[in-house]
Design a protein with these regions (language model features):
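Active-site rim elements
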Residues: 166-172, 176, 220-222, 321-334, ...
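Conserved alpha/beta catalytic core and glycan-binding cleft of carbohydrate-active enzymes
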Residues: 96, 110-142, 232, 236-357, ...
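Short glycine-biased active-site loop of nucleotidyltransferases that positions the nucleotide triphosphate
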Residues: 62-66, 259-263, 405-406, 446
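Residues immediately flanking
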Residues: 20, 103, 198, 251, ...
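Secondary-structure capping and boundary motifs in well-ordered enzyme cores
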Residues: 11, 227, 305, 332-336, ...
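Carbohydrate-interacting/catalytic domains
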Residues: 1-53, 59, 86, 91-92, ...
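Acidic/aromatic-lined carbohydrate-recognition and catalytic surfaces
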Residues: 2-184, 188, 201-259
Length: 460
């Protein structure tokens, strides 16, 4: 793994995802920036955050939210300077917070200097990409009917993620060395690790036509290839293990079984995000009912399959579930607490997505806010051996209620999650209620309240 078993500092970390452009604006230009993040370090520390995960900070034309990178060794001038980043890393370190960053390694922007030189005919950089006088196969793009796009000079280039994101040719040793060098550049500055975006499509094992594929035509030639696994292993050996950094993989159409293989190859953890489908207002109730069942199934599978799941906690204003509530802000808040509590109680690393509620200074003083709930739950998790070290077991429950235990040494906790707006009759275990989204004195003996998250402790 990227960090040796004795040095896995990230095992019990609380990670907070920040999208710099929308987090905090320090200079009044309506664009969040790195100095703005520095100004909020006290807030992040009080929340209980151990690691900041920065969204894209590289220069980019922003045709894909900044993941279309035009320089892997520079800072987007809208977000600040290299000195600002150095200051963020230094000041975060003072308060016990590490900084990691997103890095899209499958492609570049079509405005990257490498790609410009490639189209100009520079043979070295032409081999950094898949450039041809014609479409070499019938592959579909992940967002288009064809993975091939035509440049102004009449040449075709492979761009699976989109027209403006030409794929890098990782079978070229020069590409490997330049990308490994870019990682070393940031690690030498004190970056604690990376979230590698679209890492599972970096290696193409063939340029042959694609047949039927459950995800996308041609996917059998670039999704989860052995070559991709070999590159991950090599990056771990050459770079990550030497810095004891934390590396998370992210990619399209990743499921728990695939995640397990990538972690065996050198990643420390991988995003397994079971996304919830949205629907029209007419089917929202049906969708919500179906999705609660789906969510519980996905969570349970991830807990059994992955050694270190990433428990992605979407904010109350960004989660797809919020669509079901419309203007019903109270129920949206109540559900968000259950959803957040569940993720903070599961085995794995909580990855909290920045949301509007976290940028409002009023929420820090509101005991009913999601901020307050999250802060208390993080503190509870950090002080509980069962939640920080314990094993997971699911307990039988109604289809839209999740009950599971976390157990370590002399402590067993029963965690109850009611994802519905109605009371649910369940069998309660344990000796004493230690945490709830409701006032403990108001709880009923045989029912979970609507959208209730509850923890009951039991001495073993």
């Amino acid at each position: 793994m990227a960090a040796s078993s004795a040095k896995k500092w990230w095992k019990n970390a609380i990670i907070y995802q920040i999208y710099p452009r929308t987090f905090c604006d320090s200079n009044g230009d309506n664009i969040g920036d790195i100095p703005g993040i520095i100004s909020k370090l006290h807030y992040l520390k009080e929340l209980g955050v151990d690691v900041i995960a920065l969204g894209p900070i590289f220069p980019s034309p922003r045709r894909d939210s900044g993941y279309d990178t035009s320089d892997f060794k520079a800072i987007d001038p809208d977000l600040g300077t290299m000195e600002d980043l150095d200051r963020l890393i230094s000041r975060a370190k003072r308060v016990g917070i590490k900084v990691m960053m997103d890095m899209c390694i499958a492609s570049t922007s079509d405005e990257h200097e490498w790609f410009k030189k490639a189209l100009e005919g520079d043979e070295k950089y032409k081999n950094y990409y898949y450039i041809s006088a014609y479409k070499r196969n019938n592959w579909h793009g992940l967002r288009s009917r064809s993975a091939w796009n035509k440049a102004e000079n009449g040449q075709w280039y492979l761009s699976i993620m989109g027209k403006n994101q030409p794929d890098l040719n990782w079978s070229n040793p020069d590409v490997y060395e330049d990308m490994a060098d870019a990682m070393r550049f940031w690690l030498d500055k004190g970056i604690a690790g990376f979230r590698l975006d679209t890492m599972n499509i970096i290696y193409k094992n063939s340029m042959a036509d694609g047949g039927f594929n459950i995800f996308v035509k041609g996917g059998e030639h670039y999704l989860y290839t052995q070559g991709c696994r070999d590159i991950i292993k090599r990056l771990n050996q050459d770079v990550w293990s030497k810095y004891k950094c934390f590396v998370i993989g992210e990619g399209t159409s990743i499921f728990p079984d695939d995640s397990k293989h990538f972690c065996e190859d050198g990643l420390d953890a991988i995003f397994f995000c079971g996304r919830i489908d949205s629907g029209s207002k007419k089917v929202q109730k049906l969708q919500a009912r179906r999705n609660n069942k789906k969510l519980i199934k996905l969570v349970d599978k991830g807990q059994h399959t992955l050694e270190t799941p990433i428990n992605y906690v979407e904010s109350g204003d960004s989660t797809t579930y919020a669509k079901y509530f419309g203007n019903d802000k109270q129920n949206c808040l109540n559900f968000s607490k259950v959803y957040t509590g569940m993720h903070l109680a599961l085995v794995g690393i909580p990855f909290i997505n920045d949301g509007e509620y976290c940028r409002d200074p009023k929420v820090e003083d509101d005991p009913t806010s999601l901020y307050s709930f999250t802060s208390k739950m993080i503190e509870f998790r950090k002080n509980s051996k069962a939640l920080s070290e314990g094993v997971y077991h699911r307990v039988a429950a109604p289809y839209d209620v999740l009950i599971f235990t976390r157990e370590a040494k002399e402590e067993r906790l029963y965690i109850y999650c009611n994802f519905t707006p109605a009371p649910r009759q369940v069998e309660f275990y344990g000796d004493r209620i230690v945490f709830s989204t409701y006032d403990i004195g108001s709880l009923e003996p045989f029912f979970l309240k609507p959208y209730e998250f509850r923890i009951i402790a039991s001495n073993i």
